[in-house]
Amino acid sequence: QDKCKKVYENYPVSKCQLANQCNYDCKLDKHARSGECFYDEKRNLQCICDYCEY
């Protein structure tokens, strides 16, 4: 069983529009495994940091 947590970060939309900016921020600033942008239920772009450990 792996320890897995995903943390929702509120990032400016501009960061999600730049290629992989969210991914870089999650890795460099948050020490996460990766990051990705997605639309929430209000159609706002969010950045989610993936802290899953394998």
Swiss-Prot record:
Assigned keywords, A-Z: Antibiotic, Antimicrobial, Disulfide bond, Fungicide, Pyrrolidone carboxylic acid, Secreted, Taste-modifying protein
Disulphide connectivity of cysteines: C4-C52, C16-C37, C22-C47, C26-C49
Modified residue annotations for Pyrrolidone carboxylic acid: Q1
InterPro entries xrefs: Scorpion_toxin-like_sf (IPR036574)
Localization per Swiss-Prot or TrEMBL: Secreted
Superkingdom in the source lineage: Eukaryota
Main location: secreted
Subunit structure: Monomer.
Family: Belongs to the DEFL family.
Job of this protein: Taste-modifying protein; sweet-tasting. It is 2000 sweeter than sucrose on a molar basis. Has a pH-specific antimicrobial activity against bacteria (B.subtilis, E.coli and S.aureus) and the fungus C.albicans.
Name recorded for this polypeptide: Defensin-like protein
Species, as recorded: Pentadiplandra brazzeana
Classification lineage: Eukaryota, Viridiplantae, Streptophyta, Embryophyta, Tracheophyta
